């Protein structure tokens, strides 16, 4: 919202976590005019094209200038974006992701929740993920949801993710914060939004690999592997890959009160 406003020459003031209501994340006010710059326009233009690409990426790095620009977004917010290019370290992180897959898929509650979000793009729900996210045609999304809910596919998912990281992810990216509370989570989201748009504007893409952070026992191991005093909040892959279909989302009128 702040990025879009700047594109239109509007300055917004954001008050984060303004009340004791945990669902009241921010109060946003229009405070005046601002002179937009080229970056504002580039990020705004990238919004309709932003996708999560879960396939393997090309074996080439993002340009150094783009990597620095993404890291600077995090630094400006007092957070850290660690880019992992080392092959050995990426393999170690791949092992953590695979272990997280096995742990999560062994839990029927996790499988039920994941399956509940798998819908065809033609579904009336207009949210969630298509079965294409799991390598199947969109028309088989309902079948895919049934399979996910019923069977523990952790070993297969783990093997596929590990292969994709080792041989199809030239850069792993870890967003991290000094502390680990609601304000840190909100800041991470704001940094993430800007970084993803920066990648999209440059023709790159990204995907989430957050298993080592979602599984409580693995998060300290990821932190130790990164040799950081910051707390990991998000693990992602950055690179160049094939374009993905747009994910269906609810109309604007459905999400405004």
Residue ranges and their predicted role:
Residues 2-257:
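Acidic, surface-exposed loops and disordered segments
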């Amino acid at each position: 919202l702040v990025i879009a406003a700047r594109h239109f020459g509007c300055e917004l003031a954001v008050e984060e976590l303004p009340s004791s209501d945990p669902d009241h994340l921010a109060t946003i006010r229009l405070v005046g005019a601002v002179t937009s710059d080229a970056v504002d326009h580039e990020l705004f233009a990238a919004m309709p094209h932003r996708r999560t690409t879960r396939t393997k990426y090309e074996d080439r790095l993002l340009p150094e200038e783009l990597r620095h620009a993404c890291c600077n977004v995090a630094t400006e917010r007092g957070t850290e974006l660690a880019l992992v290019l080392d092959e050995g370290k990426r393999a170690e992180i791949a092992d953590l992701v695979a272990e997280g897959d096995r742990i999560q898929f062994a839990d029927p509650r996790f499988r039920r929740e994941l399956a509940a979000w798998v819908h065809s793009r033609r579904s009336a729900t207009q949210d969630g993920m298509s079965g294409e996210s799991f390598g199947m045609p969109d028309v088989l999304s309902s079948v895919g949801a049934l399979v996910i809910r019923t069977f523990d596919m952790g070993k297969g998912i783990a093997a596929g993710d590990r292969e994709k990281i080792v041989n199809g992810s030239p850069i792993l990216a870890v967003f991290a914060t000094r502390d680990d509370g609601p304000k840190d989570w909100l800041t991470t989201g704001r940094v993430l939004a800007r970084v993803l748009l920066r990648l999209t504007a440059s023709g790159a893409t990204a995907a989430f690999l957050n298993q080592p952070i979602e599984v409580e026992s693995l998060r300290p191991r990821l932190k130790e592997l990164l040799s950081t005093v910051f707390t990991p909040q998000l693990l992602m892959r950055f690179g160049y890959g094939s374009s993905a279909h747009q994910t269906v989302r609810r109309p604007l009128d459905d999400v405004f009160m």
